Amino acid sequence: MEVHNSLHCTAPVLSSLQASASGSGTPKKTAASSAAAQNSKQLLDQLSQQQKAQEEAETHSRRDCDSPASSNSEPEKDLDELRDLNGSLTGSGSVGKSNGSLSGASSTTSAPAGTSTPGSANTNGSASGAASLSVVSATAHLKKRITSSRTPTRKAHRIKFYRNGDRFYPGITIPVSNERYRSFESLYEDLTRLLEENVKIPGAVRTIYDMVGKKITALEELEDGQSYVCSCNNENFKKVDYNTSSQPLANLTLANNSRTSSHRLAKLQRPASPLKNGVLNSIAPVPVGGGAAANGSPLNTSRFSERDSVVHPRIVTLIRNGTKPRRIIRLLLNKRNSPSFDHVLTAITQVVRLDTGYVRKVFTLSGVSVLQLSDFFGSDDVFFAYGTERVNTVEDFKLESEEQRAINAIRKTLRTAGTACKGPKPKMPVKSKKAYPPGELKAQAEAQLQASAAPANEDEEQAALLKSTGVEVAELPAAIRDNYTLSQIIGDGNFAIVLKIKDRQTGIPHALKIIDKSKCKGKEHYIDAEVRVMKKLHHPHIISLIMDVDQDTNMYLVLEYVSGGDLFDAITQVTRFSESQSRIMIRHLGSAMSYLHSMGIVHRDIKPENLLVELDDFGNVVQLKLADFGLACEVTEPLYAVCGTPTYVAPEILLEVGYGLKIDVWAAGIILYILLCGFPPFVAPDNQQEPLFDAIISGVYEFPDPYWSDIGDGVRDLIANMLQSDPDVRFTSEDILDHYWTMGNEEIGCGDYSR
């Protein structure tokens, strides 16, 4: 290891050492001089050990040393000077190679023999004392330089980080240095982990801003003692009065071994929501490492355990105080914007926009004052919002007919439980792509084998199998042809076919997707986007990409194989699923969507055909995986391209007003509805698109009897929140996982559905 801060004996230090040597050459050495010699000897030993360690390190690595000899010259020189100094103090040796030999006798001034010299004793004594002080000063100076050479790293900056747009969050303070964080990605990872432990965030930290909204692009721009704002999922900077006066809830300073701590969970095991990453945790959060909270703060534990036990996603209706008829607004409350009572007031303030400013008072429809967080998540779902103005309890809490009609229209979808279905039962839409039902796969494979007339070898068998697909065996990439054996066709679409293949060594089945580029003219960017997105994904409920090979005519993707087929075929066979089976599937789908959305990726084509299922021996679904990322893309701004499958398309896509991640939630709501009753909520005669699109845009649907008579209110509430026409109040993918029905806590409830 190269010593960058080499030791240098300056001229004043050397002169003081020489003076101490001449003073110590008198016959009468003082006790102070002896002590100085002792200190100098100890210092010499320290420097010798340092030089030895340096030489050993240099034998292993000389990468950054242009001149090893020159790099050692200064420490060696200092070492020689200290050796000479030590010899002088003990009465022998010479001081300094470059300064010539200086013996102890020649450095003293004594009177001739027999001559009386008054005061000579005092002179020698004072010189000895001065020399001792000089030696002590010199050794202290050198010790300081030795210490500095051993600690070349600079002190880490202590920096506070806030959550973007959260004016109540007190922030976290962590040390930041180039030694601790080699890149922004490692800093983002730690900030994401720390924020998830204290507040609900919509995804991973992706951007850091200073307090005026300037984007930080390099670690060197972070200044010691300053504050910065963390943004998730490419959010724009929100200029609010951040809580700079409050102390953090807990000391969240990272320990030096935080990167390798056994208490730190991997990202896949640290869901912001219990089901985010496909694992159902208990309702009460279990602190990492045992009893106390992960950051050791009792206050932190009590605050967030209250939030987790009280807060669940729901949409509330707000009546803005003002001239009648008053404005009525809807607001989605969840664990991300409602961790405390003050946070809810802030969220209400931002949507109602009172003339008097900040919302100070909230009342229920019956006039009861809302004083605590749990009041927003009880039986009441309509609230009056006031500022500092006076409340007239007699007139203000009386709804006009126009206001009552508006509230009833909002509740309409929750009042259709007793509606009888008129006419025949609606049907499922036609499958949007060709696929072979599971029962026909075996027959198809047998027919192909018989038609091949018992091929002489495996190569001929594979050639016969590919013949109908238009793909020649010789065209297959060597990496696929040499490592996998081809099996039956398990599906095809407009641009691709899918074959079942097996690993020649392990026998593990996979799926081979062959995309015909000639059929994708002008749409090649979709193929590139699919591969690019899938390479980023690693999740238990998302199909894994194992290998991709790009050729001039075809793109070959080796994918994870799921034996149960797709969900569309499963629905066709059983017609409808129980609530418990539907809960399993929506958990897995919500987990996959939450993972995608945390990375800023929207799927854009969620439908039963793109959901693959694993079945147990009794035909029950035990696992669901999301597949086919041909339309997936990263969202950095509103999207306007009209795409997807008609039955599952969200209204904002049809209206072409711009859309984002929540179109996936709409599609998942349609699927959940289908799972429970066997048909979609929006239908049109003969699957005509225009009437279907009109129905989707209207947002009006029902839960008709007898198909919904045995289905509970909890899942109806979840569907109603997933199928909100306004994307601002529609559930997020995390809200799906946080909903009490999804978590199996239907005793919590969410209001009265009989109104």
Swiss-Prot record:
It comes from the Eukaryota. Residues 157-243, 314-397 form the Doublecortin domain. Residues 484-742 form the Protein kinase domain. This is Serine/threonine-protein kinase GA29083. SMART domains: DCX (SM00537), S_TKc (SM00220). Residues 18-128 are annotated as: Disordered. Belongs to the protein kinase superfamily. CAMK Ser/Thr protein kinase family. CaMK subfamily. The keyword Ribosomal protein does not apply. Its EC number is 2.7.11.1. Residues 18-52, 100-128 have a biased composition (Low complexity). The keyword Transmembrane does not apply. One of its GO terms (molecular function) is protein serine kinase activity. Keywords: ATP-binding, Kinase, Nucleotide-binding, Phosphoprotein, Repeat, Serine/threonine-protein kinase, Transferase. GO terms for biological process: intracellular signal transduction. InterPro entries: Doublecortin_dom, Doublecortin_dom_sf, Kinase-like_dom_sf, Prot_kinase_dom, Ser/Thr_kinase_AS. ATP binds at residues 490-498, 513. It catalyses: L-seryl-[protein] + ATP = O-phospho-L-seryl-[protein] + ADP + H(+); L-threonyl-[protein] + ATP = O-phospho-L-threonyl-[protein] + ADP + H(+). Residues 53-66, 74-84 have a biased composition (Basic and acidic residues). Residues 87-99 have a biased composition (Polar residues). SUPFAM superfamilies: Doublecortin (DC), Protein kinase-like (PK-like). The active site is at 605 (proton acceptor). It is an enzyme of class 2 (transferase).
